[in-house]
Structures are given as C-alpha cells and as structure tokens.
Amino acid sequence: MRKVTKHLNGIINAMVRCQLYVASVAMMMSLTACSDDDEPASGPTPTQNEAKMVLDKDKLAMIYSLRDLEGNKGRIYEMDYTVDYKLDKALNFGIHDTQSLKMFVALNLMDTIISTKSMNISYDAGCSAFACPDKTSGDYLMGRNFDFNHKDQNSNRIPIPVIAVHTAPAGGKKSVSFVDGQFVDYKSGFYTDGESDLSMLMALPYLLLDGINENGFAVSVLKLDGNPTQQQETGKKKIFTTVAMRMLLDKAGTVQEALTLLDKYNMCTDNVPASYHFFMADAKGDYAIVEYTNPNLDENPNKMEILTGNDTLRCVTNFYVAPSMGETAHGMKYSSHGMERYKILRQGLQEKNYLLTSDEGMNLLKKVAQGPESELTTGFTQWSEMYNLTKRRVTMSILREWDKTFSFEVK
C-alpha cells in the first residue's frame, strides 16, 4: 500500500506542474476554416515536438494529427480526438477539483509520468452569451464570447492557442468543443516551438469551455465572483465543471436532458475566489442558465437553480441572475462584473424583438468584446462564436478579428 501511495504521489507531483482548468474511435468531422490571405492546413502540421508522457501508437498518431488552421501561425488548431477518453470512468472517479482531474488524466490517459516545467500564471475572466431565433431562417442561435486575460509573472499578456476538439465516442454523441490551450501551459505556436511537451493534448476532452453536439445542444461556462461551488448531497457523486460539460455534450440531446443529468451529481469547483454558471441552448429553441447559489457569501454555493425567461434571462455575463442572490454583492442588483456588457446584450436583443440574423448576432458580440483598453481586470476576448444549433454549425472569430472567420460543423 505504501508503494502504491508513493506512486500516486509521484504522479500528482509530476502533473501538478501542468496547469489544468476547472471540466473510442471517432469519425472525421467536416471542417472549413480559412480566409483569403491564409493557407489552411490540408493535413497534419509537421512538428518535431515530443509527447514524452505518451507511448501508445494510436495516441501518438492522434497527437501528431493536429492541424494549424492558418498554415503556421500557431493561433488556432483543430484535432480529431480518436482514442477513448474514458468518460464513464471519469464520472465514477469522483473528480471534484483540479488535483483529482490531474490524477485521472495521469492514471487513465497518460502512459508514463515525467516532471515538466511550470509557469507562473495569473488570469481574470469575463464572458458573455445569449440565445435567440434567426429572424430570416427560423434556425436557433447561441452567441458566445470567451474572455480570459492570461498574464505571466510580469503581468504581460500571454497569447493563447485555441484548439477545436472533435470527438465521436462509442455509444455517445459526436461534438466539437473549444479549448484555451494556456490552461495546460501552451502558448501560441506551442505545437512547433521545438520545446513544448505535447503530452497534455491527451487532456483536451476535459478542458472544454464551450461546444455543440450532433443534436444541436450547446453549452458554455462563464465565471462568477465569490466562493467556489461545493455541493455535498448524500448519495450523489462529485463532478468537476469541465467534466460535467463533457458529460453533457456526450449524453444530452436537449436542455431538459442536460438539466436532468446535472441534477444527479454534486457540482464542485476549486478556483478561489471564483465560481461558474452554465448557459445552454438547443435546436428546439429551449435555453437555460444553471447556477449554484448560496446567499450567505461566507459559505460555498450549494443549491442548483435553473433559470429561464424571455427577457432578463436570455443573456448572461458574470453576475448571478438567480433572485436568491439578488441582494448579495455578486447578484444582479449590486454586482458590476459584466453589468455593462449585460445591458448591451439585453438592449440589443430587445431592439430586435429577440430575433437576430447570425451576422447581427456576431455584431452584438462585437459590441461586448473586450480588449486591452476595456475592463482590464475581467477579461480579454479570445474568441467569439455564433452557434447555429439547427444546422450544428459554429462560426468563430478570434482576437476580435471580425473580418476573418472559421467554420466548424458536426455531422
């Protein structure tokens, strides 16, 4: 037993240096991604970088299939995740914090453990999302800005790589999801920099920040202020934020199915001081905000609340919208975190009677996008997306480059 404990401790100590965020053979997904002045990758992007913790040939083939969607700029990549990422085992593992997620990845997705170089990173987040029908086609849409301000120890902004991850698990639903590579210490250009260990690409299915599946169900996560969520209901297994999102994309076809799944688990996060809420929508036009609440801000949020509504709850940013949190410092009445963005989103939806085209939706995201000159402490817009839930398609711009888009489709 002592040897087993020593082995696990060695695994944890090795993996703790790799930054992780919050939480089967695949078919090739259809992807178009280019602009007039870029040369999209027609195949895997060549690299000399090693994956030192991976020995299995199928895993290595998958890692070396990564594609740079701008040729060789190192800003946005695509991967087909073609090996088993063992979701059912992850759900039974009881992943409840960053450390237990690291342990799961080490024990189940890696082949060997070595020490890796770490970075000192600070970050601030502030995201935006909304849902509405398309006024011309009748398709259902979801808009999303992912805002995250990665900084190094000298407070310089760290440029990130976006990674689009296609999955098609045996017995589960096909999906495409999006990952901020900096959460595993990857900077822009990491794949061909000659030094980054590519092993942490094995963790990608559990690092998603938003995504859509074959049924047109989409989910995103947004930051809240305050203590991290810690549910402790008897008889329920614990689940970490991004593991929950992976579960929803793999198993839920609608918002209602997603809500039923979430209710079976104790949600847990460990980022201090921060919690999260989910914004989700589906191809039937349903949408919801899921929050974990506790009006006593000295305690951890522990009550799951489901919130829907045509006006105030059709969009969301970074404060609690649950009435139970309304009189707290982090609720709608007093919080300033994302309030201006929320007002812009709500007004934009109201003015269009909650009916927008995809282009109008992207313009609305543009209005609430954040750069170095605005809301410095709450985020930096890394990517903006319009999800067409009906067509299972995502149109993305990165870094507020609105004239250049990347399109992803789940078939």
What function would you assign to each model-found segment?
Residues 246-249, 259-262, 346:
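Non-transmembrane alpha-helical segments in soluble domains
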Residues 260-270, 278:
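Secretory/export targeting leaders with adjacent low-complexity proregions
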